[in-house]
Amino acid sequence: MGDVDKWIEDVKKCKYLPENELKKLCEMVCDILLEETNILPVSTPVTVCGDIHGQFYDLEQLFRTGGQVPHTNYIFMGDFVDRGYYSLETFTRLLTLKARYPSRITLLRGNHETRQITKVYGFFDECFSKYGNANGWKYCCKVFDLLTIAAIIDEEVLCVHGGLSPEIITLDQIRTIDRNGEIPYKGAFCDLVWSDPEDMEYWGQSPRGAGWLFGHNVTKDFMAINNLNLICRAHQLVNEGIKYMFDGKLVTVWSAPNYCYRCGNVAAILSFETAEKRQTKIFLAVPDAERVIPKQNTTPYFL
């Protein structure tokens, strides 16, 4: 663990690893992820987090708010990269923690953890500008391919990046998805990372062009069939950091404060003492005086 401990200390300072060391780290994490099921069982206490999007200094604020790993257990519900200034450092920070404390931190796949999306929204360009080639991005994409789809807390609370799918009736259908690879353009896997809840009864077409809008009755039926008490998801900016829907049965958690350095929103994490007993913790963006803003950002970060 000597290498990993050194990496943890280096990356805490918002430094990225040399290319050969990133390769080694990604290979270590891939070996861990290969052992994880599509729905990873997690026990309380645990803290659930939403999108981070490369906002490294705000991720550090999240850890100050919720507690450091390994003293606090975490589930991060995807979208670690793109749009923020420090996607590489942010993802590397989470990977070092996963390598060192694999049972203390769960990393779920978001819709941004794909080759296609990261080529458009900043992560590819950032890796290329920092390493001078695409190798670092390729190593990270191999990790993306293996990130688990969902987590279930105490067999009662389902955590997933986006939402539900008309092709998924039971949790066992999620367990049988072949997740090792790019997320398809349509189908169950795609829906789980792209769908959004909407104030409606059943299913609707998503304006995102991927996934679905899913309503109250759909959610209620899915939860009854699978003996769930709550669904946690991320994927949508919430100005208050957290938003409950469907009679409190579904919650959106957003963990990137002042999203894209301009939205003015607060962020939240959801701390579960037990599956029933939980506490929302709100935090603000780190002041500009306490963060380093790159002199040149070649990729538009708000698209």
Swiss-Prot record:
GO cellular component: cytoplasm
Keyword field contains Cell cycle: no
GO terms for MF: metal ion binding; protein serine/threonine phosphatase activity
Residues involved in Mn(2+) 1 binding: D51, H53, D79
Its biological purpose: May be involved in controlling cellularization or in regulating transcription of the genes involved in this process.
Subcellular location: Cytoplasm
Cofactor dependence: Mn(2+)
Entry's transmembrane regions: none
Reaction catalysed by this enzyme: O-phospho-L-seryl-[protein] + H2O = L-seryl-[protein] + phosphate; O-phospho-L-threonyl-[protein] + H2O = L-threonyl-[protein] + phosphate
Name of protein: Serine/threonine-protein phosphatase 6 catalytic subunit
High-level lineage: Eukaryota, Metazoa, Ecdysozoa, Arthropoda, Hexapoda
Residues that, per the record, bind Mn(2+) 2: D79, N111, H161, H235
Enzyme nomenclature, EC number: 3.1.3.16
Cofactor binding: number and manner: Binds 2 manganese ions per subunit.
UniProt-annotated catalytic positions: H112 (proton donor)
UniProt entry keywords in alphabetical sequence: Cytoplasm, Hydrolase, Manganese, Metal-binding, Protein phosphatase
Disulfide bonding pattern of the chain: none
Alphabetical list of Pfam families matching this protein: Metallophos (PF00149)
EC top class named in words: hydrolase
SUPFAM superfamilies: Metallo-dependent phosphatases
BP GO annotations: G1/S transition of mitotic cell cycle; mitotic cell cycle; negative regulation of JNK cascade
PROSITE patterns documented for this protein: SER_THR_PHOSPHATASE
